[in-house]
């Protein structure tokens, strides 16, 4: 779809700072690039390749692929960031292309910043494009290790 942000990212028109974390025929993952300034480190987007708005529209193969990638990427985020928890959120309101936000929740995150406003914590780990690229390289390595059964 021409105007869809995630379709544009996947076809290379808007490449993510950290590059592609994972891609196959059904799913795609990249680190979120939401801010002009320092980026929250550990916010990964898992998307369907096919432009489809919600879970109810998935084929069984797509649903399996999304679920498996969420699990693998969550483990990789915990290993690479030291996160205590990885939040998975889906709203489907702004961009009608199925995507799940995986967000690392770091140790010491105050209770006021738990759940949906975790990225508002002023002391949360943030970084420039180089820091995002470095984290993404570690995430790709962790995903490769997971594929070999190492994590």
Please give the residue ranges for each predicted region.
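HIT superfamily nucleotide-processing domains
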Residues: 1-151
């Amino acid at each position: 779809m021409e105007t869809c942000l995630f379709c544009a990212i996947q076809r290379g028109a808007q490449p993510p700072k950290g590059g592609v974390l994972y891609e196959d025929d059904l799913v795609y993952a990249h680190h979120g690039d939401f801010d002009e300034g320092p980026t929250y480190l550990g916010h990964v987007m898992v998307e369907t390749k096919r432009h489809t708005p919600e879970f109810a529209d998935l084929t069984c193969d797509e649903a399996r692929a999304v679920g498996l990638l969420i699990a693998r990427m969550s483990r990789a985020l915990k290993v690479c960031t030291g996160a205590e928890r990885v939040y998975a959120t889906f709203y489907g309101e702004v961009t009608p292309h199925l995507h799940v936000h995986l967000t690392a929740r770091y140790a010491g995150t105050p209770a006021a910043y738990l759940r949906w406003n975790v990225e508002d914590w002023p002391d949360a780990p943030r970084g420039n494009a180089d820091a995002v690229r470095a984290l993404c390289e570690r995430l790709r390595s962790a995903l490769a290790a997971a594929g070999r059964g190492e994590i």
